Amino acid sequence: MSAKELPSQDSPAACDPLADTPTPRPFDLSTLASNGLRRGFTTGTSATAATKAALTLLLTGSLPESVDVSLPDGLHYLRVPITETPQEPGWACASVIKDGGDDPDQTHRARITVRLRRNDSGKVVFLRGEGVGVVTQPGLRLAIGEPAINAVPRQMMRQALEEVLETDSQDLGFDVEVGCENGESIALRTFNPRLGIHGGISILGTTGIVEPKSLASFMASIAVYVRVALGERPSEIVLSPGNLGQRFARGHLALPIKQIVQMSNFAGFSLDCVSETLEELHHALPLLWIVGHPGKLAKLIDGVWDTHSHRSAGAVEALLPVAEAHAPLLVDFLRDSNSTESFIERTGGRADVLPFWSATEAAIARAVEGRVRGVQEIRVRLFGMDGTALGAAA
């Protein structure tokens, strides 16, 4: 997922721009986020702490009560408590209870366990333990069949091994098996099944810290859904602000759910993700559907790519030029309407409303065409709040 800047928790030592290697300082979870909620730490940080503790146990015969995990920003470390766990022959085992802070996270309080042993490969080999998922389809930047342990947590775990051994990871040879107690049932309450991750949770995190109810985390999820939607180089996908697009795509296009991305208010960001993913895949998408209510999508005509009502003007203003050009008798209806849904209700059944909505769909498609790259055709379908088709689908 996309990285989010950690809270600064500034100090002269940590932030001195002249310092070549600033001394890492502790990250204080007791400092609340800007929204007044408590931060936590990720499954990736949990697995890293358990890895560090397991190696310490292997080398010293003693399991530490806590370990310090270096965070990816290079400026902070987090002290993480270690939980006792039964030992198994041939392995060193350690567990961490994940603390998600005040974020509504399904993995909050999950027990993340690492089993560690030496191997003769000279490499760190990541293994899937019980309750951690396996990747079954492309688009996640992990090979099919790999454990669902993302790139940043893997690097954090390698670094933790290096810190304990005081040596470069090229000299390491360890099997690191990551598991999660009840992970398979926890994962059913997440989007993992939709993303093609089966059998358990994912080990995630780009900063190591959970920002409660974070906008960046939500946008990072959109980026993942786009990559999964495009992962098998399909002929078409759907972007929609909400459930209308999903209902249309499932009912009329017979598309699998993984090819339907709910972009919420973040139309511009979602289109940028499509462009970037297509470039990564060296793939041209034959058809992109943009489907939803005109209260959101009409704003794209004016180049408004964040459609949240608090951050953008209403859609009625964007529709006025379309009405003036294609259905002049509707202009007064628009001006007298306080919302697009009100306009839809007042003009239903008029002969000139269908060409108006068709022209609106075409205008939205032109706007999207100017934003997205690597797409051969764009089709827009608009619906009222009750699911009634307004334009070409009517």
Named regions from a protein language model:
Residues 6-31, 38, 195-202, 206-359, ...:
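A structural signal for small-residue-enriched, beta-sheet-centric alpha/beta enzyme cores
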Residues 2-189, 193-195:
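Generic N-terminal targeting/processing segments that precede catalytic cores or assembly contacts
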